[in-house]
């Protein structure tokens, strides 16, 4: 293997006898395998084919590669690149590099007779070929076999090519929305269906716009299309909110109904205000965080809520006395217990509060009225003692008639419950 690499690179003999008769490998062998110096010195424009070594043959054809002096070059190892000059930006495949010899260029497409040249593929898509076959048939519909026949008759390349192109024709007919399948009638002879061009895409397909398969267009239901045409234009992004005419009519009828039936004659003014059109609502601009303090108007509204909420100040004698002075118009009912003669001790948080002067006469008058009532009851009882003879008493029978009837019914219910037990 080492001898082959050294012989191809021209580095000299692969083996040299040493002083001891052994084999010595030169450093050029390692450099030829690992060095990439040839890649930096490689130039496409200045590439020249090296001459063959005298008296030797090149069985592998390595020296036919232009501009490659190193055996490790990928161009030398690829036999598909033989005989084809390389151009930057244009990759060369193995099939195209072997077809034409050097110096022979392919003819332009206009000068090629596709009906007789079996080596040049027509520069048309399969959809275009199908459309051309349908147009050439002069019929409204065509079968799949007729499409195959027209393509092979007019393009010699497909007569000698692999028959897999027929699968591509069938796939285009099935997947392309430009073609419609027409079922065969019962009385028509033959097998299979027909194909024709969709009139919606006929003009664009014939002009060459549908050389490749496109996505199907979006179809809108006719009902939605009419509704979209009847509705007004869309609401603009900026500006006040607009309401359609139907909503305005409903709002007007609701206002008229509530203004006539829901409001009486005495509230005519309020009903009149309801019938007025509603003002447009203006959106409030949010205040930045730096202006979170209340405005002067808000401070005026919050002014009555301000006050001294200190408990010591609230229960101060002077403050509480001033508050109790406002209770003079109220009638305070004193307690009905005999302890009303005792002085009331008002003490809050260890602070004594004097009893108002208005409480004194009311307590004394209530005590006098209580004594008078007790005296009146005692004297009336003494004047009308209980008559034990029974002449002035009610007979006990009427008093217990209702009670006896209720007691008898209760006992009867309990007897029925006892039977179940």
UniProtKB/Swiss-Prot annotation:
Origin: domain of life: Eukaryota
Subcellular location: Nucleus
Chief site of localization: nucleus
Keyword vocabulary terms for this entry: Activator, Ciliopathy, Cilium biogenesis/degradation, Disease variant, DNA-binding, Nucleus, Primary ciliary dyskinesia, Transcription, Transcription regulation
Polar residues bias spans: 90-99
Residue stretches of biased makeup (Basic residues): 271-284
Name the record gives this protein: Forkhead box protein J1
Gene name tied to this protein: FOXJ1
């Amino acid at each position: 293997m080492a001898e082959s690499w050294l012989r191809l690179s021209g580095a000299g003999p692969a083996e040299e006898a040493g002083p001891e008769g052994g084999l010595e490998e030169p450093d050029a062998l390692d450099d030829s395998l690992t060095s990439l110096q040839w890649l930096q010195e490689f130039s496409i424009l200045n590439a020249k084919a090296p001459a063959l070594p005298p008296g030797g043959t090149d069985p592998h054809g390595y020296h036919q590669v232009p501009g490659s002096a190193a055996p490790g070059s990928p161009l030398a190892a690829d036999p598909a690149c033989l005989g084809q000059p390389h151009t930057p930006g244009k990759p060369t495949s193995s099939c195209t590099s072997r077809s034409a010899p050097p110096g022979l260029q392919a003819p332009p497409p206009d000068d090629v007779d596709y009906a007789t040249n079996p080596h040049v593929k027509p520069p048309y898509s399969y959809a275009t070929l199908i459309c051309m076959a349908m147009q050439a048939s002069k019929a409204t519909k065509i079968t799949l076999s007729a499409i195959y026949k027209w393509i092979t008759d007019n393009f010699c390349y497909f007569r000698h090519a692999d028959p897999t192109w027929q699968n591509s024709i069938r796939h285009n007919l099935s997947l392309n929305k430009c073609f419609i399948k027409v079922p065969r009638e019962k009385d028509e002879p033959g097998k299979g269906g027909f194909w024709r061009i969709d009139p919606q895409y006929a003009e664009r397909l014939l002009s060459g716009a549908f050389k490749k398969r496109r996505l199907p267009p979006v179809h809108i239901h006719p009902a939605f299309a009419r509704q979209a045409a009847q509705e007004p234009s869309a609401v603009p992004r900026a500006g006040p909110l607009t309401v359609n005419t139907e909503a305005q009519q409903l709002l007007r009828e609701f206002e008229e109904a509530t203004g006539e039936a829901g409001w009486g004659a005495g509230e005519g003014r309020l009903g009149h205000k309801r019938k007025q059109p509603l003002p447009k609502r203006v959106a409030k601009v949010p205040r930045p965080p730096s202006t979170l303090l209340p405005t002067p108007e808000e401070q005026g509204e919050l002014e009555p809520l301000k006050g001294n909420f200190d408990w010591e100040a609230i229960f101060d004698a002077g403050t509480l006395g001033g508050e109790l002075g406002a209770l003079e118009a109220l009638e305070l009912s004193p307690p009905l217990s005999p302890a009303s003669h005792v002085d009331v001790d008002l003490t809050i948080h260890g602070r004594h509060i004097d009893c108002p002067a208005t409480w004194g006469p009311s307590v004394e008058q209530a005590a006098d009225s209580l004594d008078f009532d007790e005296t009146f009851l005692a004297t009336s009882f003494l004047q009308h003692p209980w008559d034990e003879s029974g002449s002035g008493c009610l007979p006990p029978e009427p008093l217990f008639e209702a009670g006896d009837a209720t007691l008898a019914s209760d006992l009867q219910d309990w007897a029925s419950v006892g039977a179940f037990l």
